[in-house]
Protein backbone atom coordinates (compact mmCIF):
# COMPACT_ATOMS: atom_id res chain seq x y z
CA UNK A 1 0.00 0.00 0.00
CA UNK A 2 1.45 3.36 -1.03
CA UNK A 3 0.95 6.46 -3.13
CA UNK A 4 2.95 5.71 -6.23
CA UNK A 5 3.79 7.50 -9.47
CA UNK A 6 4.76 5.25 -12.35
CA UNK A 7 6.46 6.65 -15.40
CA UNK A 8 4.62 9.96 -15.26
CA UNK A 9 5.35 12.83 -17.59
CA UNK A 10 3.74 16.26 -17.79
CA UNK A 11 4.00 18.19 -21.04
CA UNK A 12 2.95 21.79 -21.57
CA UNK A 13 2.93 22.74 -25.20
CA UNK A 14 6.05 21.23 -26.73
CA UNK A 15 7.98 21.26 -23.48
CA UNK A 16 8.19 18.55 -20.86
CA UNK A 17 7.95 20.07 -17.37
CA UNK A 18 8.07 16.83 -15.39
CA UNK A 19 9.42 13.34 -15.84
CA UNK A 20 9.73 10.67 -16.78
CA UNK A 21 9.49 9.86 -13.09
CA UNK A 22 8.87 7.00 -10.69
CA UNK A 23 8.39 7.75 -6.99
CA UNK A 24 6.69 6.03 -4.06
CA UNK A 25 5.39 7.57 -0.83
CA UNK A 26 5.25 4.95 1.90
CA UNK A 27 3.10 4.91 5.08
CA UNK A 28 5.04 5.97 8.15
CA UNK A 29 7.45 8.30 6.36
CA UNK A 30 7.98 11.97 5.71
CA UNK A 31 9.33 12.45 2.19
CA UNK A 32 10.75 15.91 1.50
CA UNK A 33 10.83 17.12 -2.10
CA UNK A 34 13.48 19.78 -2.62
CA UNK A 35 14.99 21.55 -5.60
CA UNK A 36 15.49 24.98 -7.16
CA UNK A 37 12.67 27.14 -8.45
CA UNK A 38 11.11 25.65 -11.58
CA UNK A 39 12.40 22.14 -10.87
CA UNK A 40 8.88 20.65 -10.97
CA UNK A 41 8.17 20.21 -7.26
CA UNK A 42 4.69 21.74 -7.25
CA UNK A 43 3.90 20.07 -10.58
CA UNK A 44 4.75 16.71 -9.03
CA UNK A 45 2.50 17.39 -6.06
CA UNK A 46 -0.34 18.46 -8.36
CA UNK A 47 0.05 15.25 -10.34
CA UNK A 48 0.11 13.09 -7.20
CA UNK A 49 -3.03 14.79 -5.87
CA UNK A 50 -4.96 14.33 -9.12
CA UNK A 51 -5.31 18.07 -9.67
CA UNK A 52 -3.11 17.82 -12.77
CA UNK A 53 -3.52 15.05 -15.30
CA UNK A 54 -0.32 13.40 -16.44
CA UNK A 55 0.49 13.23 -20.14
CA UNK A 56 1.79 9.68 -19.69
CA UNK A 57 2.07 7.26 -16.79
CA UNK A 58 -0.23 6.89 -13.81
CA UNK A 59 -0.64 7.62 -10.12
CA UNK A 60 -1.74 4.75 -7.89
CA UNK A 61 -3.42 5.24 -4.50
CA UNK A 62 -3.13 2.01 -2.51
CA UNK A 63 -2.79 0.08 -5.74
CA UNK A 64 -5.78 1.63 -7.55
CA UNK A 65 -5.40 4.34 -10.21
CA UNK A 66 -6.05 7.65 -8.50
CA UNK A 67 -8.74 8.79 -10.92
CA UNK A 68 -10.75 5.59 -10.38
CA UNK A 69 -11.47 6.47 -6.75
CA UNK A 70 -14.80 8.04 -5.91
CA UNK A 71 -14.21 11.64 -4.76
CA UNK A 72 -15.44 11.02 -1.21
CA UNK A 73 -13.38 7.86 -0.75
CA UNK A 74 -10.30 9.56 -2.17
CA UNK A 75 -10.77 12.59 0.09
CA UNK A 76 -10.80 10.33 3.15
CA UNK A 77 -7.38 9.02 2.13
CA UNK A 78 -5.63 11.92 0.43
CA UNK A 79 -5.37 15.49 1.73
CA UNK A 80 -3.59 18.40 0.07
CA UNK A 81 -2.32 21.71 1.42
CA UNK A 82 -1.56 23.97 -1.59
CA UNK A 83 0.85 26.90 -1.52
CA UNK A 84 -2.06 29.32 -1.37
CA UNK A 85 -5.68 28.78 -0.35
CA UNK A 86 -8.17 31.48 -1.24
CA UNK A 87 -11.40 31.91 0.71
CA UNK A 88 -13.74 34.80 0.01
CA UNK A 89 -16.18 34.26 2.86
CA UNK A 90 -15.85 35.29 6.49
CA UNK A 91 -15.80 31.81 7.98
CA UNK A 92 -14.28 31.50 11.41
CA UNK A 93 -11.08 29.52 11.80
CA UNK A 94 -13.07 26.70 13.43
CA UNK A 95 -15.51 26.64 10.51
CA UNK A 96 -12.61 26.38 8.07
CA UNK A 97 -11.21 23.42 10.01
CA UNK A 98 -14.68 21.83 9.99
CA UNK A 99 -14.71 22.01 6.18
CA UNK A 100 -12.21 19.17 6.29
CA UNK A 101 -14.84 16.94 7.82
CA UNK A 102 -17.07 17.07 4.73
CA UNK A 103 -16.04 13.61 3.43
CA UNK A 104 -17.01 12.08 6.79
CA UNK A 105 -20.37 13.80 7.33
CA UNK A 106 -23.37 13.50 5.05
CA UNK A 107 -25.34 15.95 7.20
CA UNK A 108 -24.56 18.61 9.79
CA UNK A 109 -21.35 18.20 11.75
CA UNK A 110 -21.56 16.10 14.89
CA UNK A 111 -19.55 16.00 18.09
CA UNK A 112 -16.89 13.77 16.52
CA UNK A 113 -16.39 16.31 13.72
CA UNK A 114 -16.09 19.16 16.21
CA UNK A 115 -13.59 17.20 18.30
CA UNK A 116 -11.49 16.43 15.21
CA UNK A 117 -11.51 20.08 14.13
CA UNK A 118 -10.52 21.35 17.58
CA UNK A 119 -7.73 18.76 17.84
CA UNK A 120 -6.45 19.90 14.44
CA UNK A 121 -6.47 23.54 15.58
CA UNK A 122 -4.51 22.48 18.66
CA UNK A 123 -1.96 20.72 16.46
CA UNK A 124 -1.30 23.91 14.50
CA UNK A 125 -1.44 26.34 17.45
CA UNK A 126 -4.57 28.06 16.12
CA UNK A 127 -7.19 27.11 18.69
CA UNK A 128 -7.05 30.64 20.13
CA UNK A 129 -8.14 31.86 16.67
CA UNK A 130 -11.19 29.56 16.53
CA UNK A 131 -13.76 32.36 16.64
CA UNK A 132 -11.80 34.81 14.49
CA UNK A 133 -12.84 35.51 10.91
CA UNK A 134 -10.44 33.82 8.50
CA UNK A 135 -10.29 37.05 6.48
CA UNK A 136 -8.76 38.93 9.43
CA UNK A 137 -5.88 36.49 9.92
CA UNK A 138 -2.30 37.00 8.84
CA UNK A 139 -0.82 34.94 6.02
CA UNK A 140 0.92 32.57 8.41
CA UNK A 141 -2.19 32.15 10.54
CA UNK A 142 -4.26 31.37 7.46
CA UNK A 143 -1.74 28.77 6.35
CA UNK A 144 -1.88 27.05 9.73
CA UNK A 145 -5.70 27.11 9.78
CA UNK A 146 -5.73 25.54 6.31
CA UNK A 147 -3.40 22.83 7.57
CA UNK A 148 -5.88 22.27 10.41
CA UNK A 149 -8.57 21.70 7.77
CA UNK A 150 -6.48 19.02 6.07
CA UNK A 151 -5.53 17.36 9.36
CA UNK A 152 -9.21 17.24 10.33
CA UNK A 153 -9.95 15.69 6.94
CA UNK A 154 -7.46 12.88 7.56
CA UNK A 155 -7.94 12.50 11.31
CA UNK A 156 -9.61 9.08 11.28
CA UNK A 157 -7.66 5.84 10.68
CA UNK A 158 -9.17 3.74 7.89
CA UNK A 159 -10.39 0.17 8.11
CA UNK A 160 -8.31 -0.54 5.00
CA UNK A 161 -5.71 1.52 3.21
CA UNK A 162 -3.67 4.46 4.43
CA UNK A 163 -3.81 8.24 4.71
CA UNK A 164 -1.59 10.53 2.64
CA UNK A 165 -0.82 14.17 3.37
CA UNK A 166 0.65 16.33 0.58
CA UNK A 167 2.07 19.70 1.65
CA UNK A 168 3.24 22.33 -0.84
CA UNK A 169 5.69 24.67 0.89
CA UNK A 170 3.88 24.47 4.25
CA UNK A 171 6.50 26.63 6.02
CA UNK A 172 6.78 29.41 3.43
CA UNK A 173 4.88 32.12 5.32
CA UNK A 174 5.64 30.99 8.87
CA UNK A 175 7.94 32.32 11.56
CA UNK A 176 10.75 30.12 12.82
CA UNK A 177 8.86 28.55 15.73
CA UNK A 178 5.79 27.73 13.65
CA UNK A 179 7.89 26.23 10.86
CA UNK A 180 9.01 23.59 13.34
CA UNK A 181 5.53 23.24 14.85
CA UNK A 182 4.00 22.47 11.45
CA UNK A 183 6.66 19.92 10.55
CA UNK A 184 6.36 18.33 13.99
CA UNK A 185 2.64 17.91 13.29
CA UNK A 186 3.51 16.29 9.97
CA UNK A 187 5.98 13.98 11.71
CA UNK A 188 3.33 12.92 14.25
CA UNK A 189 0.94 12.18 11.38
CA UNK A 190 3.56 9.87 9.88
CA UNK A 191 4.31 8.25 13.24
CA UNK A 192 0.59 7.43 13.51
CA UNK A 193 0.80 5.46 10.26
CA UNK A 194 0.14 8.18 7.71
CA UNK A 195 2.46 9.27 4.93
CA UNK A 196 3.64 12.82 4.28
CA UNK A 197 5.12 14.41 1.17
CA UNK A 198 6.32 17.96 1.81
CA UNK A 199 7.72 20.36 -0.77
CA UNK A 200 10.35 22.38 1.09
CA UNK A 201 12.95 25.00 0.21
CA UNK A 202 14.88 24.90 3.49
CA UNK A 203 17.35 22.03 3.25
CA UNK A 204 17.99 22.06 7.00
CA UNK A 205 14.30 21.65 7.80
CA UNK A 206 14.10 18.86 5.24
CA UNK A 207 17.14 17.13 6.73
CA UNK A 208 15.75 17.42 10.25
CA UNK A 209 12.24 16.09 9.66
CA UNK A 210 12.34 13.89 6.56
CA UNK A 211 13.07 10.19 6.46
CA UNK A 212 13.89 10.53 2.77
CA UNK A 213 14.62 13.40 0.40
CA UNK A 214 13.87 13.56 -3.31
CA UNK A 215 15.99 16.19 -5.05
CA UNK A 216 14.43 17.49 -8.26
CA UNK A 217 16.16 19.32 -11.09
CA UNK A 218 14.70 20.11 -14.50
CA UNK A 219 11.65 17.96 -13.84
CA UNK A 220 13.48 14.81 -12.76
CA UNK A 221 14.58 13.15 -9.55
CA UNK A 222 18.37 13.42 -9.49
CA UNK A 223 18.89 12.06 -5.95
CA UNK A 224 16.69 10.04 -3.60
CA UNK A 225 17.51 8.69 -0.17
CA UNK A 226 18.07 9.52 3.47
CA UNK A 227 19.20 13.13 4.04
CA UNK A 228 22.63 12.03 5.28
CA UNK A 229 23.12 10.06 2.06
CA UNK A 230 21.73 12.69 -0.30
CA UNK A 231 23.06 16.01 0.96
CA UNK A 232 26.62 16.77 -0.08
CA UNK A 233 28.64 19.82 -1.03
CA UNK A 234 28.81 18.58 -4.61
CA UNK A 235 25.06 18.02 -4.93
CA UNK A 236 24.11 21.42 -3.51
CA UNK A 237 26.63 23.16 -5.79
CA UNK A 238 25.43 21.24 -8.84
CA UNK A 239 21.69 21.54 -8.25
CA UNK A 240 21.34 24.84 -6.39
CA UNK A 241 24.45 26.71 -7.55
CA UNK A 242 25.56 27.32 -3.97
CA UNK A 243 28.82 26.60 -2.13
CA UNK A 244 28.09 25.03 1.25
CA UNK A 245 29.55 23.05 4.09
CA UNK A 246 27.58 19.94 5.04
CA UNK A 247 28.35 18.97 8.63
CA UNK A 248 27.03 16.73 11.37
CA UNK A 249 25.60 18.65 14.30
CA UNK A 250 25.32 17.19 17.82
CA UNK A 251 21.73 16.32 18.64
CA UNK A 252 20.46 16.91 15.11
CA UNK A 253 18.82 13.94 13.35
CA UNK A 254 20.17 15.09 9.99
CA UNK A 255 23.13 16.96 8.52
CA UNK A 256 23.41 20.74 8.70
CA UNK A 257 23.90 22.76 5.50
CA UNK A 258 25.89 25.98 5.98
CA UNK A 259 25.91 28.33 2.95
CA UNK A 260 29.20 29.96 1.94
CA UNK A 261 28.23 31.73 -1.28
CA UNK A 262 27.24 31.13 -4.86
CA UNK A 263 29.08 28.35 -6.63
CA UNK A 264 31.00 29.17 -9.82
CA UNK A 265 29.15 28.30 -12.99
CA UNK A 266 30.26 25.05 -14.61
CA UNK A 267 29.98 24.36 -18.33
UniProtKB/Swiss-Prot annotation:
ATP binds at residues 35-42. The keyword Cell membrane applies. InterPro entries: AAA+_ATPase (IPR003593), ABC_transporter-like_ATP-bd (IPR003439), ABC_transporter-like_CS (IPR017871), P-loop_NTPase (IPR027417). CDD domains: ABC_Iron-Siderophores_B12_Hemin. The keyword Transcription does not apply. Keywords: ATP-binding, Cell inner membrane, Cell membrane, Membrane, Nucleotide-binding, Translocase, Transport. Its main location: membrane. Residues 3-243 form the ABC transporter domain. It is found in: Cell inner membrane. PANTHER family: HEMIN IMPORT ATP-BINDING PROTEIN HMUV. This is Hemin import ATP-binding protein HmuV.
Amino acid sequence: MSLEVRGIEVWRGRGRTLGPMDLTLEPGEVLAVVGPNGAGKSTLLSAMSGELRCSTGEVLLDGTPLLQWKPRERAMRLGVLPQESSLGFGFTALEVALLGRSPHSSRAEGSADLAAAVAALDATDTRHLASRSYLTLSGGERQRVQLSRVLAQLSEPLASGHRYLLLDEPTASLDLAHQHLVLEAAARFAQAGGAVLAVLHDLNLAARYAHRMAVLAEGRVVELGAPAQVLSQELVARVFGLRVQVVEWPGSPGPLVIPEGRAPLTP
